[in-house]
Amino acid sequence: METFNFSVPQDITVGKGSLSKLPEIAKKLGGKHALIISGPHLEKMGLVKKAADYLASVDIKADTFTDIEANPSVTTVEKATAKYLESGADFIVAFGGGSPMDVAKAVGVVAKYGGSVTDYEGAHKVPGPIVPLIAIPTTAGTGSEVTAFSVITDHSRNYKLTVFSYEILPKYAILDAELITTAPASVAAACGIDAFIHAEEGYVSTAASPFSDALAEKAMALIGKNIRRFVANRNDIEAAEAMMTGSLFAGIAFSFARLGNVHAMSHPVSAFFDVPHGVANAVLLPVIAEYNALADHGKYLTIYNDISPIPAYADEFEPMMLVDAIRELCTDIGIPENLTIAINNASKTGTVTKEEIESRIEPMAVDAMKSGNIAVNPRASRQCDIEMLYRRAL
């Protein structure tokens, strides 16, 4: 066994109704004034006010910033940072899905150390602890509440930049399954399959370890056996709890094992065409699972049995059975059949032709190759391979 290292330096509270623990945790943090960074949907539903009221119950003031889009931009980080500094807040509550989490982490860096989030792009460029941060996810999910990454879109170059630093890990996380029951079916599907892919890519990564494998296996089992139920009925609290716990385990797993070609390739798709992150991942997954099948050394069977209603045994299993099972799962939960459909579903300017998409394949592949995840994909990949995979996904 190769040497591996792990550290999980967070305080994580998990349980139905655990949002009520926010005042206690905020007091433990020592905060007096919060900026709640969330999204417009949660604000409309009254959940942002509910969080603010919890803080007010222990005399903690709360301001809010909810002007956050999917695939949040450098400009959004600038606006949220200005709000934080103007408000006089001394800690941040990230309340929502991956977009508010990414923005909150970036604000925590820029508010403390100045400059632009682009100054911290890459690995280990954050000089020290950031503004204290409490993360409360409302999707299952990105796992962002337990990861050391913030992904922000830089529209000036159609690029999703990543800030990677253990300094941006939230100090506290609250996982309340009741909060994810309000998600529309499409959001539940996209976020749920994203969480599954976190576990799947971490599991087959060349950087996987016994520690990450144990978490990834449990995550895939929880998500794979419950995602259909949860998308069908978000009020199924048992399925919601399984999805949220699975997302948590997947987030920790890929923090150590990293990801692979799916995430490396999906970020450019979102940057160029504004496709939701989970949807971009999902339409790429079967294509890349087929590509990686040559490098499988037994793990595909485990993944298959986590998502297929009909179990298989080693003597009858073929890796292509997993590819078919992935396609079946994606169809069942309403994921678009291919990248062309996903891009057109996301388009705000009319039909995007296959020729237009083809013209972006080379620059997308160039950007995908910049991702560190390519290096740990189980099958080696050159730029020409990435271009080929994009074309197969169309």
PLM region descriptions:
Residues 1-29:
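N-terminal amphipathic/basic leader segments beginning at the initiator methionine
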Residues 19-22, 44-47, 74-75, 99-105, ...:
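Short glycine/serine/threonine-rich phosphate/pyrophosphate-binding segments
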Residues 20-35, 54-58, 86:
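Glycine-rich phosphate/diphosphate-binding loops that line cofactor/substrate pockets in enzymes
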Residues 43-115, 229-240:
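N-terminal small/polar loop signature for handling phosphorylated ligands or for N-terminal nucleophile
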Residues 112-208, 299-302, 306:
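A glycine/threonine-rich phosphate-anchoring loop and its flanking beta-alpha core
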Residues 202-328:
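Active-site segments that bind and position negatively charged phosphate/pyrophosphate groups
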Residues 310-394:
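C-terminal charged capping/lid subdomain of soluble metabolic enzymes
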